[in-house]
């Protein structure tokens, strides 16, 4: 686990590796495979600051989420590649 605390309405996500094979069973080289667009939330900020105070985030640590291919900023912390993005960049939470 990385020691990182995002600010405000930002979350830190660890990408979940997706299968690098096509439906036909062809193995894709790393350069041809798209970066995964799902991951696990590993840290959340305190919330979005609004005129009415602070609004807590809807996602929590451990949630599996979907996000756009180009969402967030990639950072390297302790040798681990992580994504930092605003909660609004998260498209959905995977349940079940």
From Swiss-Prot:
Belongs to the GroES chaperonin family. GO terms for cellular component: cytoplasm. One of its GO terms (biological process) is chaperone cofactor-dependent protein refolding. CDD domains: cpn10. Keywords: Chaperone, Cytoplasm. One of its GO terms (molecular function) is unfolded protein binding. It is found in: Cytoplasm. Transmembrane segments: none annotated. NCBIfam families: PRK00364.1-2, PRK00364.1-5, PRK00364.2-2, PRK00364.2-4. This is Co-chaperonin GroES. The gene is groES.
């Amino acid at each position: 686990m990385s020691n990182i605390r995002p600010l405000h309405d930002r979350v830190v996500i660890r990408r979940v590796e997706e299968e690098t094979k096509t439906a036909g069973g062809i193995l894709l080289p790393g350069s041809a495979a798209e970066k995964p667009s799902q991951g696990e939330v590993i840290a959340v900020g305190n919330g979005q600051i609004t005129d009415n105070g602070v609004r807590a985030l809807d996602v929590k640590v451990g949630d599996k989420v979907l996000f756009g291919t180009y969402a967030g900023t990639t950072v390297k912390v302790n040798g681990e590649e992580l994504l930092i993005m605003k909660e609004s960049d998260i498209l959905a939470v995977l349940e079940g």
